[in-house]
Design a protein with these regions (language model features):
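Short, glycine/charge-rich beta-strand/loop segments that flank catalytic centers
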Residues: 134-146
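Alpha-helical transition-metal enzyme core signature, strongest for iron centers
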Residues: 113-121, 143-158
Length: 172
């Protein structure tokens, strides 16, 4: 018979103070004076290393979203990356229908990634107001910044090709 027991702080798997968190509505704990003198250095190297690797999805030196691409007559991905094109029923389609199927399948994949990036952004941002350690907060904010770039990049790519992403559904 399993008995319920309340976990004590000493029973927790992670014992690093950098991961100490408060309830989302506990702002009073976040402005305790002593908290400001207790910043861990656990994330400092990761944070400093990321500064050189940030990119701007709106800068054309990375990706030029204004380049035209004919999604009706050209594949966005190499054919070998699209296993659905090898299905016997699909192989009977004319070239234009195969291209449409392949590019819509790729749109679905890009939409799934975009929604995942949005989830990563929301999660990273939500950690900023519950992690008590300022180093952990800065790392979470840094990660939120990076995820926001991913959301912008994928959204711009999808919008430039199809106008908008596919919505989240039961399979996405």
């Amino acid at each position: 018979i399993l008995r319920e027991r309340k976990l004590k702080k000493s029973d927790q798997i992670t014992k690093n103070a950098a991961y100490e968190a408060v309830a989302p509505d506990d702002f009073a704990s976040m402005i305790e004076v002593d908290r400001y003198g207790e910043r861990s250095s656990d994330f400092d190297k990761i944070i400093s290393d990321t500064h050189a690797h940030f990119w701007d999805p709106l800068d054309t030196k990375y990706i030029d979203f204004s380049e035209n691409f004919d999604v009706e007559n050209k594949l966005l991905m190499p054919e070998e990356f699209l296993p659905e094109l090898q299905c016997p029923s699909v192989m009977k389609l004319d070239d234009k229908s195969k291209i449409k199927l392949a590019n819509e399948s790729f749109r679905w994949q890009m939409s799934a990634i975009l929604h995942g990036e949005q989830g990563a952004l929301n999660l990273s941002a939500s950690l900023c107001h519950i992690l008590k350690d300022q180093g952990a907060q800065e790392y979470a904010a840094n990660q939120a910044r990076e995820e926001a770039r991913h959301v912008t990049g994928f959204a711009k790519y999808i919008n430039s090709r199809w106008g908008k992403p596919l919505p989240v559904g039961q399979t996405l």
